[in-house]
Amino acid sequence: MNHIFETTVAGRTLKGEFGKLGMLSDCALNISYGDTVVLVNVNASPEPKEGIDFFPLSIEYQERLYAVGKIPGGFIKREGRPSDKAILNARAIDRPLRPLFPKGYRNDVQVVCTVVSVDQDNLPNILAMNGASLALCLSSIPFTIPVGTVSVGLIDGEFIINPTSKQREESILDLTVCATKDRVMMIEAGGEEIPEDVMYDAIMFGFEECKKIADFQQKVMEQYGKQKAELILHEIDADIEKEVREFAFDMVKEAMYITDKDSRNKAMDEVKEKVSEEFDEKYPDNLGDIGEAIYKMQKEVVRNMILNEKRRPDGRYFDEIRPLSSEVSLLPRTHGSGLFTRGLTQVMSVATLGSISEGQVLDGIEEETSKRYMHHYNFPSYSVGEVRPLRGPNRREIGHGALAEKAIEPLIPSEQEFPYAIRVVSEVLSSNGSTSQASVCGSTLALLDAGVPMKRPAAGIAMGLVTSEDLEKEEILTDIQGLEDFFGDMDFKVAGTEKGITAIQVDTKIKGLSNDCIKKAITNARKARLTILEVINNCIDKPREEVSKYAPKVFTMSINPSKIKDVIGAGGKTINKIIDETGVKIDIKEDGSVFVTAEDYESGKKALAMIDGYSREVKEGEVYLGKVTKIANFGAFVEILPGKEGLVHISKLDVKRVNKVEDVVSVGDEILVKVTEIDSMGRVNLSRKDAIKDSENNQDKDTEK
């Protein structure tokens, strides 16, 4: 049976249809908002997956180009691997949903969000997030806590829910909020140095709208939802857990209280070895339970240490940052480099400057755009002392790179101020938590070292949270390390400048965050950020005055847009000639802005002169130094500007009578000529005679003076 339900969000209809499409899926939901439509299919395996200690949830976000009436480019003509943006959207859908599944649920669950129609005013990723939650609620899968999602913009001090395409261009904030009826589950934001109080108010503004959407989903689930399948939860064998606990708890506690990471890990390895010797032969079919028992003890010790003893595993105060250091100009041949170290987390960032044309073109289901600033993040296995094959970037690396890019992008100078494409690569050399935020700091160092005139330096920090089972007690931690992230309840990343926030990413392992927790995390993050910025400023307090001698030189000029065709020439003949003769790269914008990228000053200036020549208007009455290109019986043809020739009639070659053109000029001679006429057909008539007379008159005037 087909069911249709709808509500209104920000003055537009949010509509769902369930039961018509995808009949063999557990739930296939067709959800629309304006003319944007996403088909969400959810399915789960009938039995739990054996031999794993995590919940196997898979979120896929698929963009179909037919959604915007496009045919894929390239030879194959079909969609390939997901774009980076699709991967980021899938990760964003995963984060608020995963904590709301029952603990111990081990069935494979797959959520596939296929974007099938898009209008640019209504974002498909926001619709997909709402659709994924609603589809899970309607299915037989044991998911019963709806999540509402909205985007929030900020224009002239006013918050806007789900801004349209035009409003998004004007907005200084791009905020996504996901929440249940009770608590915020996920936050993702990018902004132009948003003050902390304004950011908090924006989150709360979005939260109120999320509550309404979650309430709508709850009512739809109660009216149309399938009966939930019988819940099979993985539970550790109670007897084995008791035995392992009695044998090892004191050893685990002693090991976890060691403040040095390497010593603590070594001590825990010894504990695990003793437990293995004691129980592996006794319970050969329950090795997973034995490992889980050890994990639960570690988690209990760490959380009790923080909540009840008010201390952290490494001995720091709750608001204390690990030791910091910064360094620049590490690599002699790169355009800019920076090394940022926070405790055992260390990131080296390297900046490269290129021509405007080397920016990245973004062509997908949204309007085609390009970006000048790119950030890529690499997390090799050696950064955690492990051995793994080196592959291409995984979803986590793409996500962390995008977050650090979002944090820096609002601070990059405009194309007119700094006409370069910029790429920063952050290499994680050592990881003990918060590498994405260390990448923000490393990027700042590298950009300043490269001479990029950033608006202000930026830094990032990760805040953590530990709560009691009843959520009554909670402690917020500044600058979480790996152990606190692993056993904690929240990863609250905040990046920005001394003026305000440029990026936030928040996810949680519990059923949401209290408003007080969000406010305190944002406030404490600012204090930590200012401390880090002080360290960065002590290392390099302003951009280098000049770019590296190894960086390309960029020259700019403006030409009349109507002359662009003259500079390019038929089939690109003219512009290719300039490139061949000078070895430069040339980018011309529709408004007539010209960017010339050269390896040295001389070739850049030569290219500018040639472009100026091709784009200049020939004017009557002006005198030019031209080159004779051809001789005829009736006169000489002279090139006065690149690609622009005129005729000097034999009668105009000299002040005295000329019988033969060759008596006065030869091909290749440079002569002064005056433009006497541009006829109705655009032909240019020149006179050497008039140019000579003008020159003599000017000399006479100078003599009189």
UniProtKB/Swiss-Prot annotation:
Q: What one GO molecular function would you report for this record? A: RNA binding
One Pfam match:
RNase_PH_C
Q: What class of enzyme is it?
A: transferase
For the KH domain, which residue ranges apply?
Answer: 552-611
Query: Which cysteine pairs are joined by S-S bonds?
Result: none
Keywords for this protein:
Cytoplasm, Magnesium, Metal-binding, Nucleotidyltransferase, RNA-binding, Transferase
The EC number(s) this enzyme carries: 2.7.7.8
Q: Which family, according to UniProt?
A: Belongs to the polyribonucleotide nucleotidyltransferase family.
Which protein is depicted? Polyribonucleotide nucleotidyltransferase
Could you tell me which species this protein originates from?
Answer: Clostridium novyi (strain NT)
